[in-house]
Structure formats: structure tokens, C-alpha cells
């Protein structure tokens, strides 16, 4: 299959504007008709009586209500408040995150960035 239109040379621009009335639609298309086509149902879709009204429950549903009677109903039983659990005396207290010396993170980061820039400048 070729991507070029065989009716027009490559050096000439394609024709502009809408196609002429007699040339539209192209051959192979059915003649224009009203919408919707006659084989489709008209106003009143879906046809009256379709689907038929259901009587009671559809098939596959139990006749009794939900949930089935063998399950308990209502909230679970509530117990009196017992308070928090006792502390664990055998454990060590949590460690403080400031155990190591504060190293001045901002200044250390700036110095590292400056060293990297100097090293890259020297290499390139």
C-alpha cells in the first residue's frame, strides 16, 4: 500500500476545500438515508412489554430476608474498660536520636556541594 495519493503528483499541493456534491460520498458507501435506519426501532424504545415485568424475586434469590436467621444479629457484646497495659519494666528506655554530636548538616552539605563543583570543573 502506498501512502501517496495516485491522483496528484508529489510536487503539486492537494486540492483545498470541501469535495463537490456529486463526488460525496465516495463510491462504495450506501446512499444517505434518514436517522435512524428503518430496521432500528423508532420512538418508544425499548418496545412496550420488553422486558416483561418481574413477579417477586428473580430466580436464584432466597425467599427469606438477609442475613439468614442462623447468623446473630445486632452489635457484639461490650466489655468493661480495663485500662492500658502495664509498662515493661525490663526494657531499656528508648534511645535519644541526639546521641551523636550535632554536625551542622547545612554547612556540611554546602561544603560538600562546593567540593563537588570544584572537582567537576577541574575534570571537564
Curated annotation (Swiss-Prot):
Expression triggers: Induced by heat and oxidation stress in shoots. Induced in roots in response to cold and salt.
Domain of life: Eukaryota
Annotated membrane topology: Single-pass membrane protein
InterPro entries: CYSTM_dom (IPR028144)
Principal subcellular localisation of the protein: membrane
Expression (tissue specificity): Mostly expressed in stems and,at low levels, in stems, roots, flowers, siliques and leaves.
Annotated keywords: Cell membrane, Cytoplasm, Membrane, Transmembrane, Transmembrane helix
Positions with biased composition (Pro residues): 27-40, 65-88
Pfam families: CYSTM (PF12734)
Similarity comment: family membership: Belongs to the CYSTM1 family.
Entry protein name: Protein CYSTEINE-RICH TRANSMEMBRANE MODULE 10
Amino acid at each position: 500500500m502506498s501512502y501517496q495519493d495516485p491522483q496528484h503528483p508529489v510536487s503539486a499541493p492537494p486540492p483545498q476545500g470541501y469535495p463537490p456534491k456529486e463526488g460525496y460520498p465516495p463510491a462504495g458507501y450506501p446512499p444517505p438515508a434518514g436517522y435512524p435506519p428503518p430496521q432500528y426501532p423508532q420512538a418508544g424504545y425499548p418496545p412496550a412489554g420488553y422486558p416483561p415485568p418481574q413477579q417477586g424475586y428473580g430466580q436464584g434469590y432466597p425467599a427469606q430476608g438477609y442475613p439468614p436467621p442462623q447468623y446473630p444479629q445486632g452489635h457484639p457484646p461490650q466489655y468493661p474498660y480495663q485500662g492500658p497495659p502495664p509498662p515493661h519494666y525490663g526494657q531499656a528506655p528508648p534511645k535519644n536520636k541526639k546521641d551523636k554530636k550535632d554536625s551542622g548538616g547545612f554547612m556540611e552539605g554546602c561544603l560538600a556541594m562546593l567540593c563537588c563543583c570544584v572537582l567537576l570543573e577541574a575534570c571537564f
